[in-house]
Regions:
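Long C-terminal interaction/binding lobes of large macromolecular proteins
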Residues: 1-272
């Protein structure tokens, strides 16, 4: 059974037709390990497409997460979720009950091309860069890099974390003379960035990338850190008497496994 067609937020003229998830998907994706979640998200989004299929690895990270949400809210009977957090205003634990259908109010569709062109020099040589949102291939690569990070108390941790951040910048760009291989091209851009002059080359490029990310905002309202998505929930007001005017904006890790139907433990029970 199909659900309403889904316009890709980055390219609204492209509509994707998904079907309802079925039991075999709850079995296939019942145990997504950290480090492989984005690969499974790609498989899931590709599998649920009907008609002419597109490779969701080429969609933006925002397209992919918004598609997961779209499938879920259009195929579940109850889309209410409870999120607990410690309130910074009263230091008490609150429960924020959210109807995930309400997140539709934050969805934006792009009305311009999903990329920007800038010229920033590399080693003094004028260079044309294409800036674009992170895509599924980049998410998978960053996920593998995150899984290989050393322990936080390791002497190599800060260096590895900085290199991960530069890799994220590299994956939001492309060059006209990129190698055909996605990973080879990403590695080459990473190496170029590591050898850029800090103040006159790299800093301006980062500023352009951050402006691109702000200007090309699309899909659900979310933030990204090291390629990992966080969905922005509606603000929740403090529940303590006299402090109801104060509110907290919640950022919830947008794990794909939370938006893909799971095999219910209750189905395993034998009541005979």
């Amino acid at each position: 059974m199909n659900i309403p067609s889904f316009p890709l937020p980055s390219r609204p003229n492209v509509e994707i037709q998904f079907r309802h998830p079925v039991v075999k998907e709850t079995i296939t994706y019942c145990n997504m390990e950290p480090g492989s979640e984005e690969r499974h998200v790609t498989e899931y989004l590709n599998e649920l497409q009907t008609g002419e299929k597109q490779n969701s690895a080429l969609w933006t990270a925002q397209d992919r997460r918004t598609a997961l949400w779209w499938i879920m809210v259009n195929s579940r009977l109850d889309n209410k979720e409870a999120f607990t957090y410690t309130c910074s205003h009263c230091n008490e634990v609150h429960v924020h009950d959210v109807d995930l259908c309400d997140l539709a109010e934050t969805v934006e569709l792009l009305t311009i091309e999903p990329f920007m062109r800038v010229n920033v020099p590399v080693a003094g040589k004028p260079t044309d860069w294409t800036l674009k949102p992170l895509d599924g291939r980049g998410q998978e690569l960053l996920e593998r890099m995150r899984a290989l990070l050393p322990d936080a108390d390791s002497p190599e941790y800060e260096q590895s974390l900085a290199r991960l951040r530069i890799a994220e910048f590299a994956l939001c760009t492309s060059l006209d003379d990129d190698p055909e291989s996605f990973e080879a091209a990403a590695d080459r851009r990473l190496e170029l960035m590591e050898n850029m002059a800090v103040e006159t080359e790299f800093s301006p490029l980062v500023a352009h990338i951050q402006l691109m990310q702000k200007s090309l905002r699309h899909g659900l309202l979310m933030t990204f850190n090291q390629g990992a998505a966080q969905v922005v929930l509606p603000a929740h007001h403090c529940e303590k008497e006299g402090m109801q005017m104060k509110s907290t904006q919640l950022f919830i890790p947008f794990h794909g496994r939370l938006f893909i139907p799971r095999f219910s433990a209750g189905w395993m029970a034998n009541h005979h």
